[in-house]
Amino acid sequence: MHQQKRQPELVEGNLPVFVFPTELIFYADDQSTHKQVLTLYNPYEFALKFKVLCTTPNKYVVVDAAGAVKPQCCMDIVIRHRDVRSCHYGVIDKFRLQVSEQSQRKALGRKEVVATLLPSAKEQQKEEEEKRIKEHLTESLFFEQSFQPENRTVSSGPSLLTVFLAVVCITALMLPTLGDVESLVPLYLHLSVNQKLVAAYILGLITMAIFRT
């Protein structure tokens, strides 16, 4: 005897609701945008009842504000803005879609969609462009400030190794030359002319490097 497979009981308010888009933008100067379409998707194995609520229902007309969506199907919900006035520019309204099983009254899930009326699409594009330029300038200043400490570190002066080599070369040039019998310096510290030329050459390179830093 086969037992009937029972569907697990769903917790109220935890069912994900799939709606697109999640934001509606109406433009006062473009009548084609005064009508928007919300698409409600039902990816589940059971039918869903839905209801559309609004924070300001007097400003909108919702076609099919309540209904049902078959399993693994979708449904378009048409929303019209009927109060296009300048006093509503920039005001954010909200729609809430509540879904439930056809056999139950409790809401299994909900999804909110924001709606905004703007004066013009061109003004919106201009504001977005100005915002993008401002963000770009801010980023440029950020990177410039980030690199300043590195520049100061590089130009902090000659390294200890450079100073040490310069001192060695100067000391070598001050030592007596081979054949200088009147010097009190031990003979093993006497340098040849070629050795002093090498020391002078290295000292010149070090001096140029110090001036460049």
UniProtKB/Swiss-Prot annotation:
Does Electron transport count among this protein's keywords?
Answer: no
Q: Name one GO biological process term.
A: negative regulation of transcription by RNA polymerase II
- Identify the residue span(s) of motif Nuclear export signal: 205-208
Q: Where's it mainly located? A: endoplasmic reticulum
Q: Which residues cross the membrane?
A: 159-179, 191-211
Per the record, membrane topology reads: Multi-pass membrane protein
Top-rank taxon, per record: Eukaryota
List the record's Gene Ontology CC terms alphabetically.
cytoplasm; endoplasmic reticulum membrane; Golgi membrane; nucleus; perinuclear region of cytoplasm
Sorted alphabetically, the keyword list is:
Endoplasmic reticulum, Golgi apparatus, Membrane, Transmembrane, Transmembrane helix
The chain positions of domain MSP read 16-143
Q: Where in the cell is it found?
A: Endoplasmic reticulum membrane; Golgi apparatus membrane
* Protein task: Plays a role in differentiation and/or proliferation of mesenchymal stem cells. Proposed to be involved in epithelial-to-mesenchymal transition (EMT). However, another study suggests that it is not required for EMT or stem cell self-renewal and acts during later stages of differentiation.
Question: What protein is this chain from?
Answer: Motile sperm domain-containing protein 1
Q: Which gene encodes it?
A: MOSPD1
